[in-house]
Every structure is written in structure tokens, then in C-alpha cells.
Curated annotation (Swiss-Prot):
Function: Functions as a component of both the DNA-binding general transcription initiation factor complex TFIID and the transcription coactivator SAGA complex. Binding of TFIID to a promoter (with or without TATA element) is the initial step in pre-initiation complex (PIC) formation.
One GO MF term: molecular adaptor activity
Segments of this protein annotated with the region Disordered: 1-28, 86-129, 274-332
Chief location category: nucleus
Protein name as it appears in the record: SAGA complex/transcription factor TFIID complex subunit TAF12
InterPro entries, A to Z: Histone-fold (IPR009072), TAF12 (IPR037794), TFIID_TAF12_dom (IPR003228)
Chain positions found as N-acetylserine: S2
Compositionally biased tracts (Low complexity): 7-27, 87-105, 274-283
Domain of life: Eukaryota
Length: 539
């Protein structure tokens, strides 16, 4: 499977129209993405296309899915273009540097593909994780190693079972595809396609189960290490050292990247200086060739040559011109006019000497190191006229290069993290607490609760629908489960069942007690009225 949505066989831009082609702005072209995020975007693009094909491209749902896929493809194309341009510029810089150092050498090595780099990175991460786990096994006690092996065996058993199911589903899907290609009648062909869709859905469910299983395994490993570190000081020390080493490695990688950027800048500056020198040399050569043209005999030609020489010396030596003019004036006869003219010339020469720029005492280095502007995360401003800024100039408020915000892909959850954070913020603001922040563990717990609730309700309602022998899931199926088990009622829907209510007939003793209570109340009210009247008469 290729990670490029251009190879998917469907051109999503044709479905969305030509108006979306102008949606990519200059800010998006300056954005930077990692290869992992590009792969996630490509996977999202493929899933949207497959869903649109299954639903139908002409249906409104299919059109919405195709529109979303077209947006993702536009962003992906812009980012891939920027990446290709950067790679081309780097290759050009490398070739120019190699040619400047050794012009006879021709570069034959090709730039490695992004897929190869990603595979190498994945292999490195796997090797590092295996090394880390082996080193931890050496530190663990035999009892802890046994517990770890139990975890690993449970994971392997479930993993193998999922893989067997996956292979079985793949075989059935391949058989159905062959049968669909052989069939000519539309009726049985549609039935086979429906079966194929069911098998594909089962395959997706298996993938989700595997991701959950792997995540649970990773979390259980982390908790196991933490619990063991509480009782095992050697493991505690090893984990601390490993975290420190990881931080040092990250700092080294950052320093290496900065050094590489500085070297690239210096190389570019050297290339520019070489180009400027070459241009100056070419100009000098052209000027020398023009002066070495064979002279024509005659007084006019001699005069023209003398004028050219005088102009060249004047440009190279402005002070010499002043001295020659002074000597020529000294040779002439001294008069009042000549004296005033000489005074004016001396004043102008002194002014030019005063206002001339002096050479700096500190020499300016030819290679000036400048830092490249790093991409900045651009936050969306408030919905006001000026966007929450003092000036309405977007060129001054936006940074030079912007970074793409973290792109949240479909994580197979009912509720996304962004929606949950927005909900918590709104609840906190409504209650007057201000902005409230969720801990990572609490956030994952709430998302798991939402997933469990939705899966439980849907599973039970589907069973009720099957019990009614119907293929459609209706509101009454969900309502029955919610009312009986969760005491939740769906607004706008009422149950079809008729509930009988019993009328309660009180006994004679109960009625006598009620009558005595009411009579006591009446007597107490009369006594209070008589007391108030007697007080008024006394006053």
C-alpha cells in the first residue's frame, strides 16, 4: 500500500469542483509536517474514499465524504510540493558544493526515498525497544520475570488468535471477489457484495481489537515497571538513568540539527560570494578587453584615449584629481578670479574629506551566521474585527513560517479529545471556575467510559432488534434499554407498552387517624384565633 493519495485511482478534486483549488494559502505552504503525520493523512484520505464508494458517491453522505477527502488531498499536495522543493534545493546545494570543491567529480548517489527512511526509523525504534526490554529483564528478579513472561504470553495468544481470524477473513474476501467477477446476474452479485461488506466490517473490527490489545499491553507494561521499581531499587535506578540518557540524546540531536542549519547557511553565503566575485572578474575582463582595442591613428583618437584614462583614474583616485587640478591652477597666472576659485575648490575638498565614511575599526567577517526562522504554532485569534490584535494588519501579526497544528486523526473513539476539553472548559466557565484543565489519565478514563456506554447500549439494542426479527434498529429498542437499565428517557419518544397502575384503598384505621389529625389542626387554629382576639381587647 502506497502512502500517497495520488495513487489511489480516484481524483477527488474533480468531485469538489475547481473552486477548492484556490483554498491553499501562503500560510499553508510554509507549514511543516513530519512523515508520520503525512502517512496518517494518506490513511484518512483512503478511508474517506472507501466509505464514499460504499455509501455511494451521488448520495449526500458520499458527497460530504468526497469533499473532506478533497480538502485533505489539497493540504497533502501543498505539503508534498514544499517538501520536494526543499529536497531539490538541498540536492542542488550538495551538487554545487561538490562541483566547487572538485569540478571533475559527478554525483552518482541518489537521495534515499522517504519510505526507506521511515522503514529504517521503524527498525531502529524496534531494535531500541528490544534492547531496552532485554536490559530490564536483566535487572528484574526471577519472580518479576515470570510475571512479565505471563503478560507476554497472554499478549501472544490473543495476537495469534486475531491473526488467524484475519487470514481467514482475507481468504473469504478473495473467494467472494472471484465469485463476484464470475457472476453476471445482478441479484446474486449484490448478495455477494453485501457479504463482502460484512466481512470487511469484521476485518475493521479485528484491526480495532488489535490496536486496543497493543495499547493495553503497553499500558500494562508501564504499570508493571512502575510497580516493580517501587520494590526494586536497581530497576528504579536504571529507569532514571535511561530517562536522563534519552534527554541527553534529544539535546544532542537538536544541537546537530542546528549545526547542520548553520553549515548550510555558511555554504549558501560562500556560494553567493563566489558568484559575486565571478561577476566582478567578468566585468574586469570585459573592461580590459574594451581598453585593449587597437587604436586609430590621428589626433581625435589620442584625445579620446586620454579622456578615457582620465575618467578611469578619477573613479579610482578622487583625491588625485584634486591634487592635479591644484597643480594645474598653480601653473596658471594668479588673479582674483583664480584665487576665489581655488578657495572654493579647497572648501569642497575638505567637506568631502569630512563627510566620507571612515573604515570601521572592527573588521566585518565575510561569513555572517544568521539563525533561520523556525516555524511557529499559529493560534486562531478571537472572532472580532481586528482578531484580538491592536492593528488590523495581518502581515505584521502573523509569523513568517507557521507550523501546522496537531492533526487529530480518527482514533476510533466516540468522542475526541478536543471535544472533551471544550466541554470541560464550557462547564467550568458556566459555573464560574474559569478554565479547568484535565489530567491525561482522567481524560483517557472519560473517553473509555463514553466508548463503553455507547457499545453497551448499541449491542443490547441490536439484540432487541434481532429478537423482534427486524433488520432495522429503531428508537424503541434503545429507549427500552435506557429506561430499564439507565433510567434515561429519550425526549420526543414514548414507549408502546401499556403499564397498569393499582389504586390504593386505605384501611379504616388509617382513615380514623387522618380524621383525628385534621380535627386537632382545626382546634389548634381556633385556639390561636381566640388568643389573638383577647390580646387585641386588652390593648
Amino acid at each position: 500500500m502506497s502512502s500517497n493519495p495520488e495513487n489511489s485511482g480516484v481524483n477527488a478534486n474533480n468531485n469538489t469542483g475547481t473552486g477548492n483549488a484556490d483554498a491553499i494559502t501562503g500560510a499553508q505552504q510554509n507549514m511543516v509536517l513530519q512523515p508520520r503525520q503525512l502517512q496518517e493523512m494518506a490513511a484518512k484520505f483512503r478511508t474517506l474514499l472507501t466509505e464514499a464508494r460504499n455509501v455511494g458517491e451521488t448520495t449526500p453522505r458520499g458527497k460530504e465524504l468526497m469533499f473532506q477527502a478533497a480538502k485533505i488531498k489539497q493540504v497533502y499536495d501543498a505539503l508534498t510540493l514544499n517538501r520536494r522543493r526543499q529536497q531539490a534545493a538541498q540536492a542542488y546545494n550538495n551538487t554545487s558544493n561538490s562541483n566547487s570543491s572538485n569540478p571533475a567529480s559527478i554525483p552518482t548517489e541518489n537521495v534515499p526515498n522517504s519510505s526507506q527512511q521511515q522503514q529504517q526509523q521503524q527498525q531502529q525504534t524496534r531494535n531500541n525497544s528490544n534492547k531496552f526490554s532485554n536490559m530490564i529483564k536483566q535487572v528484574l528478579t526471577p519472580e518479576e520475570n515470570q510475571e512479565y513472561e505471563k503478560l507476554w504470553q497472554n499478549f501472544q495468544v490473543r495476537h495469534t488468535s486475531i491473526k488467524e481470524k484475519e487470514t481467514y477473513l482475507k481468504q473469504n474476501i478473495d473467494r467472494l471477489e472471484q465469485e463476484i467477477n464470475k457472476q453476471t446476474d445482478e441479484g446474486p452479485k449484490q448478495q455477494l457484495q453485501e457479504k463482502k461488506i460484512e466481512l470487511l466490517n469484521d476485518w475493521k473490527v479485528l484491526k480495532i481489537e488489535y490496536t486496543k490489545l497493543f495499547n493495553n499491553y503497553q499500558n500494562s507494561k508501564k504499570t508493571f515497571y512502575v510497580e516493580c521499581a517501587r520494590h526494586n531499587p536497581a530497576l528504579h535506578k536504571f529507569l532514571q538513568e535511561s530517562t536522563q540518557q534519552q534527554r541527553v540524546q534529544q539535546q544532542r540531536v537538536q544541537q546537530q540539527q542546528q549545526q547542520q542549519q548553520q553549515q548550510q547557511q555558511q555554504q549558501q553565503q560562500q556560494q553567493q560570494q563566489q558568484q559575486q566575485r565571478q561577476g566582478q572578474n567578468q566585468r574586469k575582463i570585459s573592461s580590459s578587453n574594451s581598453t585593449e582595442i587597437p587604436s586609430v591613428t590621428g589626433p581625435d583618437a589620442l584625445k579620446s584615449q586620454q579622456q578615457q584614462q582620465n575618467t578611469i583614474t578619477a573613479t579610482n583616485n578622487p583625491r588625485g584629481n584634486v591634487n592635479t587640478s591644484q597643480t594645474e591652477q598653480s601653473k596658471a597666472k594668479v588673479t582674483n578670479v583664480n584665487a576665489t576659485a581655488s578657495m572654493l575648490n579647497n572648501i569642497s575638498s575638505s567637506k568631502s574629506a569630512i563627510f566620507k565614511q571612515t573604515e570601521p575599526a572592527i573588521p566585518i567577517s565575510e561569513n555572517i551566521s544568521t539563525k533561520t526562522p523556525a516555524p511557529v504554532a499559529y493560534r486562531s485569534n478571537r472572532p472580532t474585527i481586528t482578531g484580538g490584535s491592536a492593528m488590523n494588519a495581518s502581515a505584521l501579526n502573523t509569523p513568517a513560517t507557521t507550523k501546522l497544528p496537531p492533526y487529530e486523526m480518527d482514533t476510533q473513539r466516540v468522542m475526541s479529545k478536543r471535544k472533551l476539553r471544550e466541554l470541560v472548559k464550557t462547564v467550568g466557565i458556566d459555573e464560574g471556575d474559569g478554565e479547568t484543565v484535565i489530567d491525561g489519565d482522567v481524560e483517557e478514563l472519560l473517553l473509555d467510559l463514553a466508548d463503553d456506554f455507547v457499545t453497551n447500549v448499541t449491542a443490547f439494542s441490536c439484540r432487541l432488534a434481532k429478537h423482534r426479527k427486524s433488520d432495522n434498529l429503531e428508537a424503541r429498542d434503545i429507549q427500552l434499554h435506557l429506561e430499564r437499565n439507565w433510567n434515561i428517557r429519550i425526549p420526543g419518544y414514548s414507549a408502546d407498552e401499556i403499564r397498569s397502575t393499582r389504586k390504593w384503598n386505605p384501611s379504616q384505621n388509617y382513615n380514623q387517624k387522618l380524621q383525628s389529625i385534621t380535627s386537632d389542626k382545626v382546634a389548634a387554629a381556633k385556639n390561636n384565633g381566640n388568643n389573638v382576639a383577647s390580646l387585641n381587647t386588652k390593648k
